[in-house]
């Protein structure tokens, strides 16, 4: 049986991806989920239709916001863009896991509490994809290498598949936060994800936060779907 403390902790660790292309659809999901979800991801789909203003709206309502824009540009541009995000009181922000980009992001963050996350390898990619990009190593080795660089430059965490979470814990001495997308409930469709794990598996592997979109917003009852995922996460948090 899941305790209330485990459920509360699990709720804080669930990030619902607002993968929409207009604000009204995203706003409706937030209303439908109510107090059951406290953390949301705003990505590229909403960026050009008022994503930053919507992030302000969510924060004013007491929600935490993960701004998933995956910044990748010249260092000065990244630094200034990150500084602007910090002024919004964003909780998490992603940048590409390139050393110079991560350094610029850390500088732009300044003294704010915003957490900078380096993107390692997208969960929609597999060994064949990274081979096409010119890498001869395994996905796991590339993820670990980028995480080590993230740790060296002062980034707070990484975005990585739960499949690599255990190795990341081992190679970074538990000093990096791990945020894992590519999460699918048992038996759920993978869609465009190639490296996936269930909520239970991901939490047990060492992920700190889980990002789920379609399993919630495409469900017949999004609120019930979110609650079921939170229960599964809470079960994983309980000691054996």
Curated annotation (Swiss-Prot):
Reactions catalysed: orotidine 5'-phosphate + H(+) = UMP + CO2
Residue numbers annotated as active site: 70 (proton donor)
EC number: 4.1.1.23
Pathway: Pyrimidine metabolism; UMP biosynthesis via de novo pathway; UMP from orotate: step 2/2
Similarity comment: Belongs to the OMP decarboxylase family. Type 1 subfamily.
Subunit organization: Homodimer.
Protein name as it appears in the record: Orotidine 5'-phosphate decarboxylase
Lineage: Bacteria, Pseudomonadati, Pseudomonadota, Alphaproteobacteria, Hyphomicrobiales
Gene name, Swiss-Prot/TrEMBL: pyrF
